[in-house]
């Protein structure tokens, strides 16, 4: 079978919720496309090529036109829907091997870490992402993730400030909800 046929088969397995078969298929596709230990990049858009070259200090990589990273990412989302966060995280790790600068992959990884209770790793991963951030929405999410860490660590003052700060970059209902929760828990309003 050629790659296009395998991609269609992957999509059929995934659509019919045969996730193990879909996983085997995307692994087979990935194995077919790997190039002698050379770094690969499945970019979503041109800016990702620039980000990759800048942050990883190399132009020695293989640009792959097949969306292997998206296949792993979509499979991870299916596992997350089924509350299989360990398997989802594994697939997101593989997705990141194919696109090391795709913020969506990393944000999903942080969501898995939250569900797995891996708070230290959540904070570390989130902080590592700071260098890749170039949108207001992503910087806001960055601060919400750090705020989540402080909520879980029972440091509501820091969390409240970080949620407020995230809203300065991109207002979100999530941050508003968390601020309201913290205001109720602390018995006072958040300073402006």
Predicted regions mapped to residue ranges:
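N-terminal alpha-helical interaction modules that lie
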Residues: 1-65
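Terminal, low-structured helical/coil segments at or just beyond the last alpha-helical repeat
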Residues: 158-192
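"A position-specific structural signal for the A-helix of alpha-solenoid helical repeats
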Residues: 4, 8, 67-70, 74, ...
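Alpha-helical adaptor scaffolds
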Residues: 44-45, 59-86, 90-143
């Amino acid at each position: 079978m050629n790659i296009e046929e395998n991609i269609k088969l992957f999509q059929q397995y995934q659509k019919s919720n045969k996730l193990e078969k879909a996983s085997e298929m995307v692994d087979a596709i990935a194995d077919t496309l790997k190039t002698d230990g050379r770094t690969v990049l499945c970019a979503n858009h041109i800016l990702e090529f620039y980000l990759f070259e800048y942050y990883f200090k190399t132009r020695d990589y293989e640009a792959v036109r097949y969306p292997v990273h998206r296949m792993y990412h979509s499979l991870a989302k299916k596992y997350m829907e089924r509350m299989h966060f360990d398997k989802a995280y594994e697939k997101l790790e593989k997705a990141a091997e194919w696109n090391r600068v795709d913020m969506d992959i990393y944000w999903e990884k942080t969501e898995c870490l939250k569900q797995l209770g891996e708070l230290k790793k959540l904070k570390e991963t989130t902080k590592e992402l700071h260098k890749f951030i170039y949108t207001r929405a992503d910087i806001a999410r960055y601060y919400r993730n750090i705020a989540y860490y402080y909520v879980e660590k029972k440091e509501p003052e820091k969390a409240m400030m970080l949620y407020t700060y995230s809203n300065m970059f991109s207002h979100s209902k999530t941050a508003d909800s968390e601020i309201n929760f913290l205001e109720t828990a602390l018995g006072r309003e958040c300073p402006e």
